[in-house]
Amino acid sequence: MSKISQQNSTPGVNGISVIHTQAHASGLQQVPQLVPAGPGGGGKAVAPSKQSKKSSPMDRNSDEYRQRRERNNMAVKKSRLKSKQKAQDTLQRVNQLKEENERLEAKIKLLTKELSVLKDLFLEHAHNLADNVQSISTENTTADGDNAGQ
């Protein structure tokens, strides 16, 4: 049987306990968890990386704001150009495939005609061959009948 015991650390910044120690039969294991402090759960659990950030509105006249806006505008422009290029590439590929499809359809028509001509030639030849075989067998049977009478 596995015996489990837990030990909670004391609440840290903003009432958050960050590390729980769990004792298993296999040994101790530290598991990072975010747990609100206090029985009432009055505050939200906040990740440590988010605790130091404060969302204060940025001054629109500051250099940092202007730099961020400029970087964002360049990123948007780059994204739109990339999207436009992708659309043009797709359109070009569609046109290439249409041309190839037309070429292949023409080839199918040509090969179908060729097949039809060859099929007709084959059937005509087979019919002539059958007529020749039949006439030869008729000649042989009449010749055999003539030879039998001699």
UniProtKB/Swiss-Prot annotation:
GO terms for biological process: B cell differentiation; DNA-templated transcription; enucleate erythrocyte differentiation; immune response; integrated stress response signaling; liver development; mRNA metabolic process; natural killer cell mediated cytotoxicity. Residues 62-125 form the bZIP domain. Residues 27-94 are annotated as: Disordered. PROSITE patterns: BZIP. One of its GO terms (molecular function) is sequence-specific DNA binding. InterPro entries: bZIP, bZIP_sf, C/EBP. It comes from the Eukaryota. Residues 56-72 have a biased composition (Basic and acidic residues). It is found in: Nucleus. GO terms for cellular component: chromatin; nucleoplasm; nucleus; RNA polymerase II transcription regulator complex. Residues 66-93 are annotated as: Basic motif. The keyword rRNA-binding does not apply. Keywords: Activator, DNA-binding, Isopeptide bond, Nucleus, Transcription, Transcription regulation, Ubl conjugation. Residues 28-37 have a biased composition (Low complexity). There is a cross-link at K3 (Glycyl lysine isopeptide (Lys-Gly) (interchain with G-Cter in SUMO2)). Residues 97-118 are annotated as: Leucine-zipper. Pfam families: bZIP_2 (PF07716). Belongs to the bZIP family. C/EBP subfamily. Binds DNA as a dimer and can form stable heterodimers with CEBPA and CEBPB. Interacts with ZNF638; this interaction increases transcriptional activation. Transcription factor that binds to the promoter and the enhancer regions of target genes. Binds to the enhancer element PRE-I (positive regulatory element-I) of the IL-4 gene. Binds to the promoter and the enhancer of the immunoglobulin heavy chain. Binds to GPE1, a cis-acting element in the G-CSF gene promoter. This is CCAAT/enhancer-binding protein gamma. It comes from Homo sapiens (Human).
